[in-house]
Amino acid sequence: MQPDFKKIHSFENNLINKRSLKDLMYQAFLNYGIVKSSIIADRVKNLTFHFATQSGVSLSVEDLRVPAKKRELIGLTRNEVETTQKRYEIGSITSVEKFQKTIDIWNNANNFLKDDVLTYFRESDPLNPLYIMAFSGARGNISQVRQLVGMRGLMSNPQGQIIDLPIKSNFREGLTVTEYIISSYGARKGLVDTALRTADSGYLTRRLVDVAQDIIVRESDCGTTEGLWATELASNNFLNLRGRLLAEPIFTQEGNLFAPANTEITETFLQTLKTLKDHSPIKVRSSLTCTSTRSVCQNCYGWHLSHSKLVDLGEAVGIVAAQSIGEPGTQLTMRTFHTGGVFSGDLTRQVRSPMEGKIEYWEGHKASLFRTMHGKMGFRLKEEVNLIIKNSFGTTISFEIPAESLLLVNTDQYVYENEIIAEIQKDTNLILEEEQKEIYSETSGEVFFNALDVKVQADKQGNTYKTNNKAGLIWILQGSFYELPAFSETLLKPGLNLSKNTLLSRTPLYNKYPGWVQIDKSDNGTGICVQNFSVTLTNAFINEKVENSSRLQIKTDNQDFQFQLTTEPNSVLKQGDTIAVLDDNTYRTTTGGIVTYSLENPQASKKRKSVKNLFKGYFYWIPEETFKFSTLDEVRLSFSKNESIVGVGEEIMPNTFSKVGGFFQIKEAEQEVTIKPGELFELTSAESQIFDKSDRFVKPGNFIVPGKIITQQLVYLEFFELNEKQYILARPVQVFEVPKEEDLSLSQSFFPYNSHEHIKLKVIKRVFYKNWEKIISNNGINLLQTFIVFDFKQEQQGLEPRLEFTPSKVPGKSFLKIALYEVIKTFENNRKSSHSSLPTTTRNFVSNKQYVASNTLIGQIETTAGLVNKLAAINPHLNSGNMKEVLILNPSDLKKVFCPNVELLKKVSVGDLVRIGTLLNDNVKSPYSGQILEIFEDHILIRLSQPYLISAGTILHATSNNLVKAGDILATLVYETIKTTDIVQGLPKVEELLEARKVLHNALLAPCPGYAYVRFNKHGESTVQLIGLDNEVQTLALKPGIKTKFNSGDFVEVSSALTDGLISPHTKLETLFSYFKNRYTSFEACKLSFKLLQLFLIGEIQRTYRSQGVDIADKHVELIVKQMTSKVCIEDSGTTTFLPGEVLNFQKMADIALVAENKGEIPPSYVPLLLGITKASLNSDSFISAASFQETTRVLTEAAIEGRKDWLTGLKENVIIGRLIPAGTGFNYLENQERLAREKGEIDATFHREAKPLSENILDLRLVKKE
């Protein structure tokens, strides 16, 4: 197309940025072709590089100029945030609305600052290198510039939720520690995403290429008259029609032909079309409706977008489509990294009043009352509204507010310039999710519900919970929260004034067991014990503090025993505790060694000897010295003595001497030196032949060496080789005897005398070493020790055993006594509450050493007020066994508000709840939120209170009139929030759609078009009633807690979502087919179902990409979706030879069914099938292509069993076997035409081969083959 030179200006003096350069090259390319455009591009490149080099643009810290207005803007924003906080404190907005408003305030401030940065650079420093780089499009973008010199703004945490603390600093000023930590979330997220998602994106591209590689433009026109209406296209944008061909002619309003069918839609064509007042609907050709077999025709595909001309024959458009969809995935992966996880929440577009004036609009428009995310009331418009603003000078401005927008003003309302009057929802991929947020009480106090509609509900497990069905306030009437002792008796009623010593409650103290009273004076007289039982050793005295420890001397008939006490007096004892250890060196060794309890072979059992068997018998000790060393240098002097005999007192290591002498060995592996006392005997070769070489004991009088050496004592023989000679080491053995009879008895006196079997002191002997255990010690050990232990056979609840010293008549000596005490716990000892406690005292009704029977009242705990104040409330819902809760009003909880004319007080009365700003009379506003307690002549007394606004649907945890502490949960707000959409959601979403994955939490779909109503049955269960166009009524069950997406009486289309949730494409296809099959033939029903599903999938994929700012031409997505929706599954074979469950191409199945009908036979029945790209690749007509993708063994085995043929139509199969690919220069048009004709002609033969009725005999089949 030649350019119109009259319209082209000869010279333009404008600043050219990246976008202008792109437009310039596009126009050159469109008008002058590829050769001239490349020359222009080359010259532009040389020109720009020349001047860029000359200018030497570089970035320095000085170029990063922070706008002067930033400080002022941050200050104003903080004031606005504080105002929002005050609104929350008076209960005008909920905590969620406060959070959302705070986020929007900071987001708006960030955007204002961004605009200010632009204005500052443009007006003050247009040659700033940062400005030149970012806004020419050379390097960086506005988001990065904003973070450098504006503010970083709001960040989202790893869960995708926005943190309401913005980063107010920029990189030029530097971040604070807190800001840096918040900032690190996004940095880490970016790095992880880049690493993980690149692989996902690459794999997605591979699957897409595999599914679409055989789509090649094989013919110029398939001859179809079908297509898509312009309104059905996913982009739904007039300009996106460019590059397509008309499927039907366009007529003007007068009926004249404007453009015939198959006309290419160019920009000029669209501009001319816009000038027409009215014309017939536009229907365009599409790959979805192309009837070419295993390909797409030129006319249905349209332009090749790289050179804006009709696509060439032999073009591999499938691979182009796959790469066009897969490549942005890699780009998108990096997107998070570039912005560093910064949140930009432009979810709505605010409409501000262009001038001051009065609002007018027609009040008859359909709308519903709605509360915005910021807590403002407005109207949700159901239809477009024409808004008019008139000012006092008669100027009128009118503009349209579209449907689904929020209108925030009433008619006849006066508005100021720049006031927000409406919010328009942007068309972004908003992911709404239900969230919960707990409301915690900031102060302690009494709960009061104001205007709440409380309903008790039960969950699936039968647990009940309370919900609120109407917006209202939870008030916390302030006061100090206290817990009174358990089982206490409250003596006062709410509302009484309290003095300092007013008694609030008393708790009686009873004992469970009889005994003697002991009052512990050390615990301020509050500790009371009752001694129930005691046992005293009568044949033992304690010598206190002899050699820094107490000694216990026990006398028996034969001798005195000295024990060392191991337990301090007044200690609490447990079963088996050791009280004293006998001072006895009978069983003490001088060195380490090996202990054994029998003269059996050392390989016998090495279990620990039981205690009861140690009161009699013997054990045997084989002494041995062992010294550890850390380096060989320590034993270097002793190397010459290794494996020889050393004497007593000989130096082994520096400053280390042998105590016993003996056979010396250095063991380098264990880093130790051993000295084994004993005699060394050398064996002759003859003796070694007959000698028993096992280690063993030899008793006195027996031979060590047969017929040669007799031992005079018990020895232990060890056999070893040394310098190729054989030796025996006879080691001496010490024998320790444990007496058979008990030689120590304890005389014990019990009180009372009938209880002696429950508690006693026992003497036991213990060993601590296993049989044949080697003990390393240089100072010796006690092999057996005698202990006095505490034996408490029957523990009684509430009794505490204690060890005591009882004075005797002998000065400096005491008796050992163990007593059982019942400790009467007072409130101070028992309480584990973190709340500040009230003053408590214990009054005793008994004296020290008084005997009391069981269940005697021995005292009471008294709780007093402590300060002059007022008792506000007692929790009425607690039983007597729990801690009792009281609320006391302190002077700080009450505030005076002076009102000069109390008689004019008509607005409020005693008991009313008022918020900050409420009018008390005509002149005075309340400075506090609270309850009016009393009204005096000149002032009002207000009890401070905190209101919390809660919305409908909130789960309540507190109960009205109950008491709560600061930090207690009052309620859980249930609300919908918008999750920040990121490629972490975006790429898996695309993959989910392309793989046609099953969806969890499906939305309920309308089974037919009609009018939908929500109905409730007598059990309170909700259902959806759908009245179809033929007046057929269908009832659908609704799950509890599921929200509907329509208003009762709305018209809904077939397969549209009735409830919240994701739409499963499989469910949608089933719904569509089950509706259409009752109204059309199987072929038509299948075709219609596929078409609607294809449009849905294309729309969803495109929406996901566009939400990330990526634009892909619809024709690419159409090709992939066509491959996913090209198969059907046979349900019933009819009279053909197909089997139920077989998967066939839809077009092939339709042809076979047509032939069957023409022959007067029953065609097979089938249902449409949606396959994900992986399954579609595996179900490809080419088994070579499928086998090279996945599951090679299975695909090849099935193909071999079925005897399949591969017609080599795609690129992949040709590459694998080494043929020229049938695309580009390898594409033969005439050959393809012949092949297409042959394929169409073979349909009838295919039917006879594959679908002949089984009833006919083999002869018929042979006749057919001959024909």
Curated annotation (Swiss-Prot):
The UniProt keyword set, sorted, is: Chloroplast, DNA-directed RNA polymerase, Metal-binding, Nucleotidyltransferase, Plastid, Transcription, Transferase, Zinc
Q: Which cofactor does it need?
A: Zn(2+)
Q: Which GO terms describe its cellular component?
A: chloroplast; DNA-directed RNA polymerase complex; mitochondrion
Q: Where does Zn(2+) bind?
A: 222, 290, 297, 300
Q: Which InterPro entries did the record assign?
A: DNA-dir_RpoC2_beta_pp, DNA-dir_RpoC_beta_prime, RNA_pol_Rpb1_3_sf, RNA_pol_Rpb1_4, RNA_pol_Rpb1_5, Rpb1_funnel_sf
EC number(s): the record gives 2.7.7.6
Q: Name one GO molecular function term.
A: zinc ion binding
Question: Superkingdom of this entry's organism?
Answer: Eukaryota
CDD domains in the cross-refs? RNAP_beta'_C (cd02655)
- What does the entry comment about cofactor binding? Binds 1 Zn(2+) ion per subunit.
Localization terms from the record: Plastid, Chloroplast
Q: Which Gene3D superfamilies does the protein's record reference?
A: 1.10.132.30, 1.10.150.390, 1.10.1790.20, 2.40.50.100, RNA polymerase Rpb1, domain 3
BP terms from Gene Ontology: DNA-templated transcription
What this chain does, per the entry, is described as: DNA-dependent RNA polymerase catalyzes the transcription of DNA into RNA using the four ribonucleoside triphosphates as substrates.
Assembly mode: In plastids the minimal PEP RNA polymerase catalytic core is composed of four subunits: alpha, beta, beta', and beta''. When a (nuclear-encoded) sigma factor is associated with the core the holoenzyme is formed, which can initiate transcription.
Tell me the PANTHER family matching this sequence: DNA-DIRECTED RNA POLYMERASE, DNA-DIRECTED RNA POLYMERASE SUBUNIT BETA
Which family would the database say this protein is a member of?
A: Belongs to the RNA polymerase beta' chain family. RpoC2 subfamily.
Name of the protein described by the UniProt record: DNA-directed RNA polymerase subunit beta''
Gene symbol here is rpoC2
